[in-house]
Amino acid sequence: MTNIRKIHPLMKIMNNSFIDLPTPSNISSWWNFGSLLGACLALQIVTGLFLAMHYTADTTTAFSSVTHICRDVNYGWIIRYLHANGASMFFLCLFIHVGRGLYYGSFTLSETWNIGITLLLTVMATAFMGYVLPWGQMSFWGATVITNLLSAIPYIGSNLVEWIWGGFSVDKATLTRFFAFHFILPFIITALAAIHLLFLHETGSNNPLGISSNPDKIPFHPYYVTKDLLGAVLLTLLLMTLVLFFPDLLGDPDNYTPANPLNTPPHIKPEWYFLFAYAILRSIPNKLGGVLALISSILILAIIPLLQTTKRQSMMFRPLSQCLFWILVADLCTLTWIVGQPVENPFISIGQTASILYFSLILIIMPTVSLVENKMLKW
């Protein structure tokens, strides 16, 4: 008798995606982060739903409603900190997931890669709007500064900013619409993630060697289910350590002060996961140029498949490209660090150098070195 999971219309989809899915036998722990992102998304939706039950999207009560959640709601503090630090875990997994795609050449699966970039942009938009909701000082001024960047767009910029604000400044209308979008976007992200998986399962996963996986595949369950569970346990350990011991480590102290339009904080900066892009924006003196550089720093991922010059997909046997990849990682860490420093020399120069290096590595240096490797290995 055929197993019900193989014939039932709904269970068959789950079976072909998570149980009997033929998976390359040699994929490493770097492939765990896709499932961890799914777990993070589920956590964010559940905790966000409970927070939304007690939150009020009004400029007069938003800050006090968050305080009420932490002080008066049963276990409200842990729900709030799980949601805030869960976002950090989400982005940590997201950056590692994208980095793994770059390192092992997964961007050759173009549909999966492009949906992934769409997912990255949507998650960034969701996180930005979520950061505005507590209505602290950094929430208010972060929203003002980032939305104001759209005024750099010629002709329609000023009208566009006022349209997003719903008035002449960030106010009640802005907060209400940001809450509405922040609530609906995670469900759109879930749909995009399902499409991401659909495209991935059309072609099958890449593997560390960058060769065809077809000759040697094993079922996803129990092998990779067990492997993913180990990753989930380790991520939970890291998240709970943050939540229970250092809940405000990745936050900004200014956000514990209610929003005040008349008092500007000395340093306006977004959450740590946006800092590399914000550093690129800040390193260009021209406003429009900065905005274009900011957008390009993310959208550059879309043209990486077009810049592929190597004849070997993975970087596993390409030591020069490996070296450049880790220089790129170090460069992104430098950009993240530089935003926390005052806007003065030598920090301005370091930021500008790191920004130029970021684009040079991806657009010029890495493709050129790949050609050199082809020559050296006589491909």
Curated annotation (Swiss-Prot):
Compartmental location: Mitochondrion inner membrane
Disulfide pattern: none
UniProt-annotated binding residues for heme b b566: H97, H196
Gene Ontology BP terms: mitochondrial electron transport, ubiquinol to cytochrome c
UniProt binding sites for heme b b562: H83, H182
Listed transmembrane segments: 33-53, 77-98, 113-133, 178-198, 226-246, 288-308, 320-340, 347-367
Leftover remarks: Heme 1 (or BL or b562) is low-potential and absorbs at about 562 nm, and heme 2 (or BH or b566) is high-potential and absorbs at about 566 nm.
GO MF annotations, alphabetized: metal ion binding; ubiquinol-cytochrome-c reductase activity
Keywords (A to Z) from UniProt: Electron transport, Heme, Iron, Membrane, Metal-binding, Mitochondrion, Mitochondrion inner membrane, Respiratory chain, Transmembrane, Transmembrane helix, Transport, Ubiquinone
Annotated SUPFAM superfamilies: a domain/subunit of cytochrome bc1 complex (Ubiquinol-cytochrome c reductase), Transmembrane di-heme cytochromes
UniProt cross-references to Pfam families, sorted A to Z: Cytochrom_B_C, Cytochrome_B
Residues annotated for a ubiquinone binding in this entry: H201
Family, similarity comment: Belongs to the cytochrome b family.
Principal localisation: mitochondrion
Record gene name: MT-CYB
Xref: InterPro entries: Cyt_b/b6_C, Cyt_b/b6_C_sf, Cyt_b/b6_N, Cytb/b6-like_sf, Cytochrome_b, Cytochrome_b_C_euk/bac, Cytochrome_b_N_euk/bac, Di-haem_cyt_TM
Assembly behavior: The cytochrome bc1 complex contains 11 subunits: 3 respiratory subunits (MT-CYB, CYC1 and UQCRFS1), 2 core proteins (UQCRC1 and UQCRC2) and 6 low-molecular weight proteins (UQCRH/QCR6, UQCRB/QCR7, UQCRQ/QCR8, UQCR10/QCR9, UQCR11/QCR10 and a cleavage product of UQCRFS1). This cytochrome bc1 complex then forms a dimer.
Cofactor: heme b
GO cellular component, one term: mitochondrial inner membrane
Function text: Component of the ubiquinol-cytochrome c reductase complex (complex III or cytochrome b-c1 complex) that is part of the mitochondrial respiratory chain. The b-c1 complex mediates electron transfer from ubiquinol to cytochrome c. Contributes to the generation of a proton gradient across the mitochondrial membrane that is then used for ATP synthesis.
Species whose genome carries this gene: Avahi occidentalis
Membrane topology of this protein: Multi-pass membrane protein
Protein name, per record: Cytochrome b
Cofactor note: Binds 2 heme b groups non-covalently.
